[in-house]
Design a protein with these regions (language model features):
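Soluble, non-transmembrane catalytic domains of enzymes that act on hydrophobic metabolites at membranes
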Residues: 1, 33, 73, 78-79, ...
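Short hydrophobic/aromatic segments of transmembrane alpha-helices and their interfaces
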Residues: 45-46, 53, 127
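Short acidic (Asp/Glu) patches
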Residues: 48-50, 108
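Transmembrane-cytosolic junction motif
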Residues: 53-69, 74
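N-terminal membrane-targeting/pre-transmembrane regions
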Residues: 1-37, 114-117, 130-131, 139-143, ...
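Hydrophobic alpha-helical transmembrane segments
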Residues: 36-47
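Non-transmembrane, membrane-adjacent beta-strand/coil modules in membrane-associated proteins
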Residues: 72-135
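A residue-level signal for beta-strand positions that form part of recognition/binding surfaces
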Residues: 3, 62, 122
Length: 157
């Protein structure tokens, strides 16, 4: 059993609002089309299903630090990044303020792949081989760094 040392859940408000409005509008037009016509609006149904899938995949960002892994996952957990605690180089941990135009979601930036639900504060930690990084949006960077240090110290003893 893995011991959870830190857990943060960030709701992705923007994607939830956009998807909810889109799904509601498309459902309204689907029902209207079915009442007024005998044809089935397959395109609207497909678009509605697409927004439902997007909503399920991206409705939240969860950051979990266990005794063995640092994990950042979106939605139900199909899109995630998982790095072993021992691979992270805590000395490279730094807060990064990203520009608003980098956007939100999974972003490929000059700093690395960012898992982001809002603009503002982010935490960037490189791995010891400098080939990968743990780059997430958070306002609790110091708590994550503390949890990572504790997990690394516990695994080294």
């Amino acid at each position: 059993m893995r011991k959870i040392r830190y857990k943060e859940t960030q709701p992705f408000h923007l994607i939830v609002i956009i998807c909810a409005i889109s799904i509601a509008l498309m459902t309204f037009f689907i029902i209207k089309q079915l009442i007024n016509n005998d044809t089935i609006p397959y395109t609207l149904i497909a678009c509605c299903l697409l927004f439902i899938v997007i909503l399920i995949l991206f409705y939240k960002l969860e950051i979990i630090i266990t005794s063995r892994y640092a994990i950042a996952s979106f939605g139900i957990g199909l899109l995630y990044k998982k790095i072993a605690i021992n691979e992270l180089d805590i000395t490279t941990a730094r807060g990064v303020k990203i520009p608003w135009y980098w956007g939100i979601g999974i972003r490929f930036t000059p700093e690395g792949t960012l898992y982001n639900t809002h603009t503002g504060g982010n935490l960037h930690i490189k791995t010891k081989n400098k080939m990968n990084e743990f780059f997430v949006s958070t306002s609790n960077a110091s708590s994550i760094i503390t949890a990572l240090r504790e997990a690394q110290n516990a695994s080294n003893t």
